Amino acid sequence: MFTLSDFDFDLPPELIAQTALPERSASRLLEVNGQTTPASFADRRFAELPECIQPGDLLVFNDTKVLKARFLGQKASGGKIEVLVERLTGERTALAQIRASKSPGPGTVLRLADAFDVTVGERVEPFYTLHFPDDCLTLIEQFGRLPLPPYIEHDPDAFDETRYQTVYAQNPGAVAAPTAGLHFDDSIFARLDAKGVERATLTLHVGAGTFQPVRVENIAEHKMHSEWYQLPQSLVDRIAATRARGNRVIAVGTTSMRALEAAARDADAAGKPLAATSAETDIFITPGYKFRVVDRLVTNFHLPKSTLLMLVSAFAGIETIRAAYRHAIDGRYRFFSYGDAMLLTRSEDALNA
């Protein structure tokens, strides 16, 4: 039904945020009301988010922590390589992307960061297995570089190491930040708590596939990358309690939404209620998808033709999102990972909204 071109738009390059603002909650927030015709918008500061949420509503955060997953290195022959660790698979093993003039075969030794050697193991398309000489996480955090998105043009510095990480990051494993969470700081949490807004966390380790472009015009043919996630029982209980009192579940970021909806979809398919789970998901949310859990979404502005733009269009309505993005561009909002945020409400008729 939909093609890639349906999710394209022209973005002035100067609106791509290259650095984070000095204060997390100083970013802007576009509150979108898709229930009106046409959609209406409120231009806010992110610090005003607590005013947009009701007591008893539940905010769901992704507590993944970004790894220093990028390495420059070389082969024994001297050939230069670049490694991006995608996923930790054991204490001393990981899956990684490797950029090299020639694909390394099993047994190839690579020198990373001029500090330690790894050995290439079996190929697990599109990744390579890497065997580390010691604890992966320790070596990655000591010698790796922060994997900033490809559209950010500067090398990571100490400011990025703080600001490309949420203040509540707990579980190391992501190679990209759950960026909607970057706007939250202690002052916002204090005001949310004072208002009686509930908070809970899940974990989804964001993979590098989040930046992979869609290369097929028929989006139904797109092959979605897979990511690991975990929903704890405490979150399942909080969602049930939120529903019981008539409040709303608000996902902070598309990664939180994907984890919640993947778990609910799989539970539905098995004829069971939502339950605690730890699993892989390659859920691909496009217009026409039936949302089961999430009522509202805090999210940043996404790339043209991206799967995340398709997701927000499925959630809030295609025309609503198009209008919101036009409003944001005209209003000089900042886009992508270090950019501003929007607050969306689920449309019951997203195909026509």
Curated annotation (Swiss-Prot):
Q: Name one GO cellular component term.
A: cytoplasm
Enzyme class (EC, first level): transferase
Q: What is its main location?
A: cytoplasm
Instruction: Note the Gene3D superfamilies from the entry.
Output: QueA-like
Q: Where in the cell is it found?
A: Cytoplasm
Q: Which GO terms describe its molecular function?
A: S-adenosylmethionine:tRNA ribosyltransferase-isomerase activity
Extract one GO BP annotation from the record. queuosine biosynthetic process
Enzyme Commission number: 2.4.99.17
Q: In which pathway does it act?
A: tRNA modification; tRNA-queuosine biosynthesis
Sorted alphabetically, which Pfam families does this protein's record hold?
Answer: Queuosine_synth
Task: Spell out the reaction equation it catalyses.
Answer: 7-aminomethyl-7-carbaguanosine(34) in tRNA + S-adenosyl-L-methionine = epoxyqueuosine(34) in tRNA + adenine + L-methionine + 2 H(+)
UniProt keywords (A-Z) are: Cytoplasm, Queuosine biosynthesis, S-adenosyl-L-methionine, Transferase
State the protein's purpose.
Transfers and isomerizes the ribose moiety from AdoMet to the 7-aminomethyl group of 7-deazaguanine (preQ1-tRNA) to give epoxyqueuosine (oQ-tRNA).
The similarity annotation says: Belongs to the QueA family.
Subunit comment for this entry? Monomer.
Designated name of the protein? S-adenosylmethionine:tRNA ribosyltransferase-isomerase
The species this protein belongs to is Paraburkholderia phymatum (strain DSM 17167 / CIP 108236 / LMG 21445 / STM815)
